[in-house]
């Protein structure tokens, strides 16, 4: 399993990456999560403009085996949904790059830094 060092992680297996402006971030699911889910066939997300609290559900991932909720890693506003998700298998193929789910304006960049780093996530998953 791949666990990039430059991301932060949640116990629910989402990742978040602050972009260069320091207040916008990309969010996706981890390689561990996509592997556990199996073949992803559909992703449903709340609309751009939706304001979320930390841990609030912002969508679902439907796989052949199951359906899983997606939880906001931090509070913020959804700015953009990944257009490539029309082909949901991109999440399996490239979860950390082309398979990102949403771009969001984070309410507090400090909240991102408080999430799990790569080593803590590695310990959580046993990888």
From Swiss-Prot:
GO terms for cellular component: cytoplasm; glycine cleavage complex. Its cofactor is (R)-lipoate. Pfam families: GCV_H. Keywords: Lipoyl. GO terms for biological process: glycine decarboxylation via glycine cleavage system. Binds 1 lipoyl cofactor covalently. Disulfide bonds: none annotated. The modification N6-lipoyllysine is found at residue 65. It comes from the Bacteria. Residues 24-105 form the Lipoyl-binding domain. The glycine cleavage system is composed of four proteins: P, T, L and H. The glycine cleavage system catalyzes the degradation of glycine. The H protein shuttles the methylamine group of glycine from the P protein to the T protein. Belongs to the GcvH family. This is Glycine cleavage system H protein. The lineage of its organism: Bacteria, Pseudomonadati, Chlorobiota, Chlorobiia, Chlorobiales.
């Amino acid at each position: 399993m791949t666990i990039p060092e430059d991301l932060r992680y949640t116990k629910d297996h989402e990742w978040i990456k602050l972009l260069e402006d320091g207040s916008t971030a990309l969010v996706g699911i981890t390689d561990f999560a996509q592997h556990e889910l199996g073949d992803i066939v559909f992703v449903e997300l709340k609309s751009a403009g939706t304001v979320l609290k930390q841990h609030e559900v912002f969508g679902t991932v439907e796989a052949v085996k199951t359906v899983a909720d997606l939880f906001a890693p931090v509070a913020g506003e959804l700015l953009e949904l990944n257009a490539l998700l029309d082909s949901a298998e991109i999440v399996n193929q490239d979860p950390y790059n082309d398979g990102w789910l949403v771009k969001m304006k984070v309410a507090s960049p400090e909240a991102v830094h408080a999430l799990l780093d790569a080593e803590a996530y590695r310990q959580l998953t046993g990888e």
